[in-house]
Amino acid sequence: MLFSLRRLKKLANLEAFSDQKVIDSLINLGFEVDQITKLNEISGIKFGQILEIRKNPEADNLWICKVQFADKIREIQTTAKNVIENKQVLAFIPGSKSGNTTFLAKKLRGHISEGMLISAAELGFNKHLLNSELDQGVLVFDPIFDLESNPLKVLELDDLILDIKLLWNRPDGNSYLVLANELAAFFKTDFSLINKEITGKFYSELKIINKTDSKIFALEIQKLPKLALVDIFLLLKSEVKIDNLAQNFANFILIYTGQPCYCLQLEKNQQKVELIEQKVKIKYEPDAISSYHFLDQEKKPLLIPEFSDQIIMENNSFFLIMPKFNLLKVKQIKQFLKKNSLKLTQLGKNYNYGTTFIALSFLNFFLEDQKIDFSWPINFDKSLISKKTFLDLNYNELKEILGLELSQEDISKTNLILEKIGYNFDNTSFSPPFYRVDIEFFADYAADFLRFYGLEKLKDCKLEQVKAKIPNPDFEPVKLKTLGYYETNSFLLISKKEDFNPLELKSQDLLTFPSQEHTKIRYSLAWQLAKITKYNQKRKITEINLYEKGSIAGWNHSLALASTIYTSEDLKKHLKILYNYDFDFLPADSEFLNPEKSQFIYLDNVLVGWLGQVVEKYNYENVTFLEILLSKVEKIPKKEGGKIKFRPYDNSQLKYRDITLSLPMKDIPDPYLKVIQKIPEIFSVKLINYVIINNQQKITYRITGPDQVCAEIDKFYK
């Protein structure tokens, strides 16, 4: 978004600071100032008031204007036909400059012209953004300015335009008030335009019947405000096209507060508006699109946002509509219209009710200053922003995250600054500013703390010397390929209706998302492999072994295997090959898993994964899965192996014993095998038979080893 540096300095009371210092502070606050452009190269212009207009008798299209300036009366010739007596103008007088041009008195068609009257385009504004009133000749306005004053200061024309790139999660930053508030906090100056209270002069009788999933707030205003010339110039600096009074007012509220607005007017006997979604077509487009319609009591459209605006009568009351539309719907409308306006862009961002509150608070101030009555907010209640989310404070963690030695005084001073932008602190917790959507974790607070504590303080930190280290090679892909698995990559995001979550992880619903099929972070990689397996089975591929490593919910890193060939016992062996840990397998009690064919995987009594098959309703009964949370496994220290002892070579023949376990259907053999595997010098334990007789599992294993192993087994069974 484009910002006027002059207006930011004015709002934040920073006139005493240099332009460069303020720009540097914006960068230190984390705002990317992508480009700095000077509005114009003008100096020496003056306010003047037209006293008399007469035609130059020696020219067809020249008018001689007698203009009163602060120092004297001058005659200036112009071709503009919109000059009016007793109106004020801006003028280059002798000695004024525009770039490399210096203006002098000059004889034109027999008469001296002591300068030149100024148009909006000559002030540095984009001609294509001007309406007919501003583009019909020279600038002409009511006589409200002191002729002694400097137009460059009064109209904020000696300005730098800052192109500031904001992060996607800072929609509140598309606002003069929010940026000015942060600057004022940074420089410790006064700022009072974001109040904590909103009022009204009367209660509106308007009823909004909302039949959509959007939120709609409104304010009834008794008269349409007319923006001052300096505020019209502010819109032009933001590359907003100048339109009628209603559009200009709505756009002004947008750039000041970040809240998109629309103006709506009703007949005197109507007090009800209905909001629906309905198809709309535009000229030269073959397709229609569903969009928002505001209807009157007779179901006639009053306003179709972004498609058709209502003409607002200047001296009649109207309603300022402040919507929070469905983000996906806005994205569809934006693509359909191939439009990239400031308002439509902001509508597509996830601003919260705090932005609406800032708009209402500013409107209180602005309308009172204009002496225009307004209602209490319609549909908006302060409770929408008073529900605060509190996060735990941990200053040791803060120091660790930032890598700084912070004193209690450093922390207290910085927190006082943060309170100016809306933070609330108590002894053990804090709540973020009511208008921010990006403060979800303690690390987000730490980032804000550093912005106001000072990024330059990081220079004082001495970096520790880090010795170069050659990373250990990752043999997992080679092992998995050797075992016959093929790697896959799936979407990180799933739809809301996909609830497969055997490990009961917590996911995050995204505030913005690409589609309804991708709205939250997946709970399980195995679930993604299941969908890929089914897709390949439909293509008549029956022998499938797949694996994937990736992120899942709760900041976990996971490995998942899926196979139509291998059994659960095979997957256990593969897990042992990949990670030489002593895993425990216990019966799985989960609504998502087949209790007779599934087990949870534990390591040191910590649940780290699952193995087996899913319940029948998912229709994946011929697929065996294994999923392990690598992020949990890596946190558990690996047990050191004992010292290696060499023994004399024994050339005697190995022997074996077959043992059969008789278990209930829901039981698993692993706990019993663990007892047997404690016998020293076992060479192998191999499954040789599995049958079900009278609802009992009969599982036969062959244990192979030297004489002493067989002796221990015989002793155990006797």
Curated annotation (Swiss-Prot):
Looking up InterPro entries in the UniProt record yields: aa-tRNA-synth_II/BPL/LPL, DNA-bd_dom_put_sf, NA-bd_OB-fold, Phe-tRNA-ligase_IIc_bsu_bact, PheRS_beta_core, tRNA-bd_dom, tRNA_bind_bactPheRS, tRNA_synthase_B5-dom
Q: Which CDD domains does the UniProt entry name for this protein?
A: tRNA_bind_bactPheRS
Q: Which family does it belong to?
A: Belongs to the phenylalanyl-tRNA synthetase beta subunit family. Type 1 subfamily.
Membrane-spanning regions, if any? none
Cofactor mode of binding and number, as noted: Binds 2 magnesium ions per tetramer.
- What are the names of the required cofactors? Mg(2+)
Q: Which PROSITE patterns match?
A: B5, TRBD
Q: Which Pfam families match?
A: B5, tRNA_bind, tRNA_synthFbeta
Q: What is this protein called?
A: Phenylalanine--tRNA ligase beta subunit
Entry EC number(s): 6.1.1.20
